[in-house]
Amino acid sequence: NYLVTADVARGDGSDFSVALVFDVDTMTQVAEYRGKITPDMFAPQLYSIATEYNNALLIIENNSLGIGVLSRLQELEYNNIYFSIKSTHEYVDQLTAEAVGGVAGFTMSMKTRPLVIAKFEEFVRNKLININSMRLTNEIKTFVWHNGRPQAMRSYNDDLVIASAISCWVRDTALVVNKKQIQHKKAMLDGIKKTTTTMNTQ
């Protein structure tokens, strides 16, 4: 299984639009895109990348530019987009999101940003992430604390760092919780099947 995390830029400034692909089980980086591309062109690019990697979970920060990309991906009918519950930021699948009014994309807020960055620092420090990109490595080296806020040094970029941090956060929170819920449901269903079989044989 794979996840693709994207950070969307306008395509005409100093920031880049980026997409990172990680193996969910090992958190090994397997692919990377970084370029100055307009949001309307980035959406089909992301569709192709996520489809190529086994219909990967596609995580896009739902800022002003990200919302447009998310809308376009929904028009393209990509069916494995990251959704969350607006009030709690809790991950839900697309079907559940439609029922409970979930929000497409990942919300990076004043509340979630420090948690996301801290999770990335934990993954890097404990070697829980395998980075195969010199560009990402260089961004990490210039990602510093400034006025109480972790960010890129002046004239440097942090697009890949932020996308990687979101990947680590989603992998270690939303996907782990979701996996446990699936295992719990499976155990319950297995128990029901076993009980039914026992009753039928008596």
Residue ranges and their predicted role:
Residues 95-102:
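Surface-exposed intrinsically disordered loops and tails
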Residues 1-88, 92-95, 110, 114-118, ...:
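RNase H-like, metal-dependent nuclease domains and their acidic two-metal-ion catalytic environment used
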